[in-house]
Amino acid sequence: MKLNVNLPHHPYDIVIENGALSQVGSWLSQLWQPQKLVVITDNRVARLYAEKVKLSLEAAGFKVFTFDFLEGEASKNLTTVNKAYEFLAKVGLTRSDGIVALGGGVVGDLAGFVASTYMRGIHFVQIPTSLTAQVDSSIGGKTGVNTPWAKNMVGTFTQPDGVLIDPEVLHTLGQRELIEGMGEVVKYGLIEDKELWDELSEMDGSPESILEHAESIIYHSCDVKRKIVIEDELDNGVRLYLNFGHTIGHAIEATAGYGQVMHGEAVAIGMVQVSRVAEKQGLMPAGITEDIIHMCQKFGLPVDYQPWNENALYQALTHDKKARGNSIKLVLVPELGSANIHQIPLEEMKEFLKK
């Protein structure tokens, strides 16, 4: 299956195909001339797939180097970025060469940021290996790293030259890593895709059912995201809909310590919390919070987090990228399958943090 992100200045394809990882060399040779490449990955993914990818790329005529770092959100920072810059310089990577991001969301965000800033920008592609990355972070060109103050505080908008998704690699994920990806999938059903929501409703919620439906839910999710990105590449309008649950979710990730609460888990908690308060205020329909809770719990996603520190969460929210002056744009779901933006004074976010 193939989807096109038809941006006027930089169109590219998303290829979704079981077994695609073994064909990465032939896929990339259709995008780039044989040249020098650096595969950026983490130590866990490197053990699983780096050699397989390297051999496929070398068979297609590419000269391949691999840079890996310690897996986890805690590595997504400027220290790791600087180590990557040093590695690229040592192997002599130039602007005519490229970067392959091989891994989950942390790898994709960091590798994309490195590619967009090294020598003022070199070509890169995304090969996501986690469900979260396959349905969300590998698409749309957002790159970035965390700081002690906020998640993804430093980053760029830089589109990849292509995205290659192999659903079969999900079989090597741990159960928690697989389940957390469903946080983003549930979000897509809520904000845009009623057909996806119906498919999720029919699933039994087990890890086996996720793997069985993987190709379909990845396709639906990517289709929603690529349409929104085409309409609003730089996050000024409808692309903000993709942040449903993320305002509070990012604050949870930051206050818990990066990596303690996984991204999809934090999004699930954020969706439930904002819906609970918005429903009480009449901003979302009656009963929708229970629907979200039921769907999240069915797939094993958390719907609450302890310790819930309202003051710490609020301080993290003040660094949110959706904040503008003393106000913030909060994404709500007025009905299943649609979203809107509710701009409120930043101070009012304290109400949305109350239990």
From Swiss-Prot:
Cofactor note: Binds 1 divalent metal cation per subunit. Can use either Co(2+) or Zn(2+).
Protein name: 3-dehydroquinate synthase
Coiled-coil ranges per UniProt: none
Subcellular locations according to the entry: Cytoplasm
Species of origin: Streptococcus gordonii (strain Challis / ATCC 35105 / BCRC 15272 / CH1 / DL1 / V288)
NCBIfam families linked to this entry: aroB (TIGR01357)
Enzyme class, first EC level, given as a word: lyase
GO aspect biological process, one term: chorismate biosynthetic process
